[in-house]
């Protein structure tokens, strides 16, 4: 899908519907199952990137970007490996702040879709 021209005010995009094609995750990051991820970049606004990201059921580690995200659908547990922080459960409506370089383990119970600002 093409990027949404965010500089054009008044444009609407549906972040829940189009299907996002998933790519399998590399074996060295997968901890359980066969999760895949898909992304749709929506563009940039004032030097900030916006997009929709999705992960299917399973568990995988990630090194995070500096971002804020809002969960649109699904459910997951996020374990913080570094820095060591308490685990969180996220679901539809959750708003989370991550910082660049955080190491996390995502255990997705129900395919998770989020809008991110990074």
Model-derived features with residue positions:
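Short acidic-glycine-tyrosine-enriched beta hairpin
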Residues: 83-101
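A short, N-terminal "cap"/entry segment at the start of jelly-roll beta-barrel domains
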Residues: 1-51
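A generic structural motif
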Residues: 79-81, 117
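Conserved short histidine dyad/triad with adjacent acidic residue
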Residues: 46-64, 100
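Short, surface-exposed beta-strand-loop junctions and turns on beta-sheet-rich folds
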Residues: 68, 84-86, 113
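Short, conserved beta-strand element in jelly-roll/cupin
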Residues: 63-78
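A short hydrophobic beta-strand segment most commonly corresponding to one strand
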Residues: 97, 104-105, 109-118
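Conserved catalytic-core motifs of eukaryotic protein kinase domains, centered on the activation segment
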Residues: 81-83, 109
């Amino acid at each position: 899908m093409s990027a949404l021209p965010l500089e054009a005010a008044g444009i609407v995009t549906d972040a829940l519907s189009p299907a996002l094609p998933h790519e399998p995750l590399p074996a060295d990051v997968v901890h359980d199952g066969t999760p895949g991820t898909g992304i749709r970049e929506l563009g940039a606004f004032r030097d900030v990137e916006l997009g929709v990201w999705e992960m299917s059921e399973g568990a995988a580690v990630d090194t995070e970007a500096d971002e804020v995200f809002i969960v649109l659908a699904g459910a997951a547990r996020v374990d913080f490996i570094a820095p060591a922080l308490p685990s969180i459960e996220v679901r539809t409506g959750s708003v989370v702040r991550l910082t660049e370089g955080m190491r996390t383990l995502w255990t997705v119970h129900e395919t998770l879709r989020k809008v991110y600002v990074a």
